């Protein structure tokens, strides 16, 4: 199990450099490109994760693979990660970096859970309403849960709005338990 706080520290360091150089977007794209290539190339994730392969050999492979595709700054960052034996964290580092960049851009992610698919128009309408309420640009993703009887649930960060039928029935049950019969 990878430690998210370790990934966050590396992402913060790289993000700090990106802000100083004014290259937040560019370096985010490069980091995501690195992760994509590593994760989709056969045997490459295992190669970078292998503890018996020396860091020098891994850095040579990284320099050959990514030398012309990313900036020297991103390549130096990857080499530093390899030196510190944190190459398995590159995916998590990229996610943490993306979260920091989104925060800088005033973007927040939200997840809508519904019993059935929701139309694109309804998704856009809900995104706009949530954006107005939060004061941030909301990027809404849909999760279909056929187990829901009806209604929907929205999660924004650590807040949950539960408007499912199951939740309403649970609240009604509690009200009935507390009602005094005379």
Curated annotation (Swiss-Prot):
Main location: membrane
Localization per Swiss-Prot or TrEMBL: Cell membrane
Keywords annotated in UniProt: ATP synthesis, Cell membrane, CF(1), Hydrogen ion transport, Ion transport, Membrane, Transport
Membrane topology designation: Peripheral membrane protein
KW Transport (keyword) present: yes
GO terms, molecular function: proton-transporting ATP synthase activity, rotational mechanism
Keyword flag Aminoacyl-tRNA synthetase: no
Alphabetized Pfam families for the sequence: OSCP (PF00213)
GO annotations of cellular component type: plasma membrane; proton-transporting ATP synthase complex
Subunit architecture: F-type ATPases have 2 components, F(1) - the catalytic core - and F(0) - the membrane proton channel. F(1) has five subunits: alpha(3), beta(3), gamma(1), delta(1), epsilon(1). F(0) has three main subunits: a(1), b(2) and c(10-14). The alpha and beta chains form an alternating ring which encloses part of the gamma chain. F(1) is attached to F(0) by a central stalk formed by the gamma and epsilon chains, while a peripheral stalk is formed by the delta and b chains.
Task performed by this protein: F(1)F(0) ATP synthase produces ATP from ADP in the presence of a proton or sodium gradient. F-type ATPases consist of two structural domains, F(1) containing the extramembraneous catalytic core and F(0) containing the membrane proton channel, linked together by a central stalk and a peripheral stalk. During catalysis, ATP synthesis in the catalytic domain of F(1) is coupled via a rotary mechanism of the central stalk subunits to proton translocation.
Family affiliation: Belongs to the ATPase delta chain family.
Protein name (Swiss-Prot/TrEMBL): ATP synthase subunit delta
Organism this protein belongs to: Syntrophomonas wolfei subsp. wolfei (strain DSM 2245B / Goettingen)
Gene name tied to this protein: atpH
